[in-house]
């Protein structure tokens, strides 16, 4: 197409477009249909396309989405420019004029910027002032949304400070141009991060704007100078207000992000909890299968499996026959038949028969094949903030809890209460009752769980020590709850009873192979778990040296009013051949069980010792003298001690040089001797005192005077 034809088309285009808009003003039709409904305009558009030969003409002018420069350089494409000056270079005018034309924004367009309320700026067409705002907009700045220009201006000082700090970091203070080491790069990076974090802290640099001096304000007599100062301060106030609103907006964005992260964390916590629940379920099923296999093997109830599925019905009949025959064969060893046969024997022979049966079961129970190893351990408690209450079990017993123990976080819990002769078993994950152990004739004072074998050892005021099978107890309890006729088990949950003490058992410690017990009869006994025999007895003839101290307020402690006498042996713990005991005279003694003699004595308490725990480095003791003392086992010296307002009733080792302490108060105290600080796990509104506590793997369970149990993450 020639140049004349192009000029002709331009003239037709202008006249057609003008006539279309003139007709639009007269007809008041829809704005969007002004040109599309105009016939001459559509014909002109069609002729333009036809004169271009084809639509490929337009595609020929492009390359990878951009228009390419033709030979005549009449088409200007700013994306194809390689230098800044080429953007404004053309054949029609100079660069300065082109720049002004391309960057010009009329006042009408600026006044058409919508505000937050949907209203437009003043329509008087006034130009923006030096401050960058319309005068009327400035008066209502606090009521309207901050503009992009204002926000940009408010952050200019921050950008300048960042550039200044970056240049300072990049400057080589040694004046050398050598290679910078990796450590220098890391230190500079960390320093940049610190500077970036501290950028919003303007401190004193923006309190007084430049050009305003407080001394001149108080001494000036020039109205113009004072007005100038006033205008500068007003502008600075507006600037700070914009900056404050922008910062508040950032804070709101951060709060939204934090809330989103919190919700995401809660979902992930729920996922972990679900995974660990499934792990516990699978562990329980594995344990149940192992117990069933041991039961079938022990009593010869295995049935030969069929070789094909076709004989399944016959196999079922043969299995029932085999069970019937086994029941007939073993009829003589059932509980009822044993009783009938034993009734014809002398009393001494009857007791011997029962003892032999118990010892055989004890030896078989502690065989190596019975030892259980968990495939997984819960870690969910580590995700809680320390001091968070995980859950609670209400009214486990009618009176205060005398002792409790659990095998693992979210595992199995056993509790005993005052004047309650039974042990109750609880599921810590579901927080419900799953079993019960009956057999003691008086209050149970102490207990300990062996999670490798799934056993519990208890000591009571009936002078008896009992070893329980927790798995069997749960199975029997489940059968009872399902209202099914319980299997006529030869076994009972009580595997063995250790009887030798002549007074109540006050403390015990369970080792992999041995059991050590302390009694009010002033003796310590060491038992073999596989044979049930007492290996040695240590007589504590000194236990009556200390009488009841008058320093202790007996009316304050619920335990003391119901237990009027201090225990002769308040606490003990054994590990291999080492034994630590805390007695009524307030002295801690370290024993060698191989010789049965004291190898070290730790003196410091002024009243009976109630609890103690030790590890490889330290020993922690609690006493009725209202103190907790931490001893160095290597030197035998006292490291730290901490005083409380009430007698210390129970404690457990939290970590090295730290302990979880119960001091007859509504809260559990965690005392860290290295940091010399103490913090508490307290339930708001609960004034019931804590009587006993156990801690394992950031998981703490405490029992209270009203029978409640609370579970904490620490």
Curated annotation (Swiss-Prot):
> What InterPro entries does this protein map onto?
G-protein_beta_WD-40_rep, Mt_division_protein_1, WD40/YVTN_repeat-like_dom_sf, WD40_repeat_CS, WD40_repeat_dom_sf, WD40_rpt, WD_repeat_multifunction
Enumerate composition-biased segments (Polar residues): 332-343
Q: Among its keywords, does the record have Transmembrane helix?
A: no
Q: Which Gene Ontology molecular-function terms are recorded?
A: ubiquitin binding
Q: How does it sit in the membrane?
A: Peripheral membrane protein
GO-annotated biological processes: mitochondrial fission; mitochondrial genome maintenance; peroxisome fission; positive regulation of mitochondrial fission
Start and stop residues of the WD repeats: 396-436, 439-478, 500-539, 561-603, 604-642, 644-681, 685-714
Q: What residue spans carry the region label Disordered?
A: 323-354
Main localisation, per the record? mitochondrion
Coiled-coil ranges (or none): 240-298
Which sequence positions carry the modification called Phosphoserine? 376
Keyword Phosphoprotein: yes or no?
yes
Effect in UniProt of substituting residue 461 to A = Slight decrease in interaction with FIS1; 20-fold decrease in interaction with DNM1; even distribution along mitochondria not punctate
Q: Which Gene3D superfamilies match?
A: 6.10.280.220, YVTN repeat-like/Quinoprotein amine dehydrogenase (2.130.10.10)
Q: Name one GO cellular component term.
A: mitochondrial outer membrane
- One Pfam family of this protein, by short name? WD40
- Which keywords does this Swiss-Prot/TrEMBL entry list? Coiled coil, Membrane, Mitochondrion, Mitochondrion outer membrane, Phosphoprotein, Repeat, WD repeat
Cellular location(s): Mitochondrion outer membrane
Subunit field text: Interacts with CAF4, DNM1 and FIS1, components of the mitochondrial fission machinery. Interacts via its N-terminal, coiled-coil extension (NTE) with FIS1, and via its WD repeats with DNM1.
Its UniProt miscellaneous note says: Present with 3730 molecules/cell in log phase SD medium.
The record's PANTHER family line, in alphabetical order, gives:
ANGIO-ASSOCIATED MIGRATORY CELL PROTEIN (PTHR19857:SF8), MITOCHONDRIAL DIVISION PROTEIN 1-RELATED (PTHR19857)
According to its UniProt entry, what is the function of this protein? Involved in mitochondrial fission. Has a partially redundant function to CAF4 in acting as an adapter protein, binding to FIS1 on the mitochondrial outer membrane and recruiting the dynamin-like GTPase DNM1 to form mitochondrial fission complexes. Formation of these complexes is required to promote constriction and fission of the mitochondrial compartment at a late step in mitochondrial division.
State the family it belongs to: Belongs to the WD repeat MDV1/CAF4 family.
Protein name per Swiss-Prot or TrEMBL: Mitochondrial division protein 1
Species:
Saccharomyces cerevisiae (strain ATCC 204508 / S288c)
Its organism's taxonomic lineage begins at:
Eukaryota, Fungi, Dikarya, Ascomycota, Saccharomycotina
Question: What gene is it encoded by?
Answer: MDV1
